[in-house]
Regions:
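Bacterial carbohydrate/catabolite-sensing allosteric modules
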Residues: 42, 85-95, 141-148, 152-341
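Alpha-helical recognition/docking segments in bacterial nutrient-uptake
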Residues: 2, 57, 61-172, 176, ...
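Residues at alpha-helix caps and immediate loop-helix transition turns in enzyme cores, especially N-
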Residues: 32, 75-78, 135-138, 193-196, ...
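N-terminal helix-turn-helix DNA-binding module of bacterial transcription factors
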Residues: 1-60, 339-340
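Short gly/ser/thr-rich secondary-structure transition/capping motifs
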Residues: 42-48, 105-108, 129, 256
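Small/polar loops that bind or transfer phosphate-bearing groups
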Residues: 20, 101, 127-128, 219, ...
Length: 341
């Protein structure tokens, strides 16, 4: 097993210097830290977790609370991608992840906070939960460092997608493609939905596009059946939309199924757009027009900022980080000549 002494000998520095470099002390230059860390990795050094825990009074374990209303779990493409980048960034700083749940030893039920304390989590990442639930509030308001994803809660650390700008970019693109009859099937009530819906109406007003009430419908996120039923209603209108925006890419697949069952072609007969930019959307034929969320940076920033707060609680900033998405034009929004818009 490689020791600090072995690394010190290779780097021609003291054991104390190696220890400081590996523990990110401020009194060593970044250049020297980098050199020592690279050498340690090259030599296959792995710190003794028990010794490190005793020394730092930390478990090097971060809890993840993820309980979306539809119970999708890790089949939730968007949050699975966010979690993956969070995991990579956390592991790069030697932290493990454990899911927060209500199960305890001997089958005894625990609250989220009780489970977090039982596991000794250094911090918690909270994503896709209902903040009106008492147990969620209890955990979020505790003294355990917390970062929330896509939700701003009190003075807690938060990393959020710019949903308002994302919807503005998506709507504007559809408008520039000649569409004026634009419908929106939005998700159920949440901070994300509120931001997107406000931006949808705001962008329409700015561009002079009238949105009839019957053009706006609601379904659950990732609900292909609900999205399909809403699509049926929109297509049955006396003056149907020329483009439908779905709450997310997965829900859009439900709309695609209904449209094709009617013998209609996308985008020749009806244009559609999704939201999220999941990998599967780029495999459809034609490729789905969508707003790609930057899951890589959402997860990475959340992990890095949470760990900074864990390790440097007196100096780490408890701020809100906004991550921009990017329009993927795809092939499902037809360029209109003006006669159909």
């Amino acid at each position: 097993m490689v020791s600090l002494k072995d690394i010190a000998k290779e780097c021609q520095v003291s054991v104390a210097t190696v220890s400081k470099a590996l523990n990110d002390h401020a009194d060593i230059s970044e250049e020297r830290k980098k050199m020592i860390r690279e050498k340690a990795e090259e030599m296959g050094y792995r710190p003794n977790l028990f010794a490190r825990t005793l020394k730092t009074n930390r478990s090097y374990n971060i809890g993840v609370l993820f309980t979306d209303a539809e119970h999708n779990g890790l089949t939730h493409d968007y949050f699975a991608a966010v979690l993956d980048s969070f995991k990579v960034a956390a592991e790069a700083r030697d932290y493990d992840l454990t899911f927060v749940n209500c199960g305890g030893s001997g089958g005894k039920r625990m609250t989220y906070l009780e489970h977090a304390r039982y596991q000794g989590f250094d911090g918690i990442m909270i994503a896709c939960v209902d903040f009106s639930e008492p147990e969620v509030l209890q955990l979020a308001l505790s003294d355990i460092p917390v970062v929330t994803i896509d939700y701003i809660f009190n003075d807690r650390l938060a990393v959020v997608s710019d949903n308002a700008k994302g919807m503005e970019d998506l709507f504007t693109y559809i408008y520039q493609m000649g569409h004026r009859r634009i419908a929106y099937i939005h998700g159920t009530d949440s901070a994300v939905t509120t931001n997107r819906l406000s931006s949808f109406y705001g962008t329409a007003e700015k561009l002079g596009v009238e949105i009839p009430d019957e053009y706006v419908m609601m379904t659950r996120y990732r609900d292909t059946k609900g999205a399909g039923e809403a699509t049926e209603k929109l297509l049955d209108l006396r003056r149907p939309p020329t483009c439908i925006i779905y709450p997310d890419d997965f829900a859009a697949f439900g709309g695609i199924h209904v449209i094709r069952e009617r013998g209609m072609s996308i985008p020749e007969d009806i244009s559609i757009a999704g939201y999220d930019g999941i990998r599967l959307a780029k495999l459809t034929v034609p490729n789905l027009t969508t707003l790609c969320q930057d899951t890589q940076h959402l997860g990475q920033y959340a992990a890095e900022k949470l760990i900074d707060l864990i390790e440097k609680p007196k100096t780490a900033m408890r701020n809100i980080t906004i991550v921009q998405g990017k329009l993927y034009e795809g092939q499902t929004v037809l360029k209109l000549d003006g006669s159909r818009g």
